[in-house]
Amino acid sequence: MSTINTDTNEAMPHISVNAQYIKDLSLENPSAPSSLAALDQRPQIDLSLDINITNLSEENFYEVELNIEATARNEKYKLFHIELKYAGVFNLINIDSEQHPILLSVHCPAMIFPFARKIISSCTQDAGFQPLMIDPIDFGALYHKKMSEHQN
């Protein structure tokens, strides 16, 4: 029989997800019901994503918020516009503060993104459209691009 030494586990560096939640959700279906009859062609999807990081009052606690907006259009209609602010509260335990920016910009968003993606998929489907399946996002590439833009 093995036992787990919790003292050692508590000293190990790790990220704890304390909460996940929808902060804001809006879906517009402005041309319904006419737009629902025009679903025989693939719409153009415009997608934007932003990450906001807030240092909370408790030490090493942060809120990481994904802001996702998507608009679908065809040649005749604006089919839908969806906005989602989805956030998580993270505790960075026994992690050097120099590593916090990359963890908060890459690893934490990657942890909550699948949940935000599912919400968007479900909402667009419930609005009468094919579910919007957002491709996986390389948060590491976004972080490095943003860092190189700040250096220039």
UniProtKB/Swiss-Prot annotation:
Gene Ontology cellular-component annotations: cytoplasm
GO MF terms, alphabetically ordered: unfolded protein binding
The UniProt record lists the keyword Chaperone: yes
Subcellular location, record wording: Cytoplasm
Annotated keywords: Chaperone, Cytoplasm, Protein transport, Translocation, Transport
Keyword flag NAD: no
InterPro entries: SecB, SecB-like_sf
Chief location: cytoplasm
Signal peptide region: none
Any matching Pfam family: SecB
SUPFAM superfamilies listed in its UniProt record: SecB-like
Organism domain of life: Bacteria
One of the GO BP terms on file: protein tetramerization
Protein family: Belongs to the SecB family.
Physiological role: One of the proteins required for the normal export of preproteins out of the cell cytoplasm. It is a molecular chaperone that binds to a subset of precursor proteins, maintaining them in a translocation-competent state. It also specifically binds to its receptor SecA.
Description of how the protein assembles with itself and partners: Homotetramer, a dimer of dimers. One homotetramer interacts with 1 SecA dimer.
Name under which the protein is recorded: Protein-export protein SecB
Origin species: Rickettsia akari (strain Hartford)
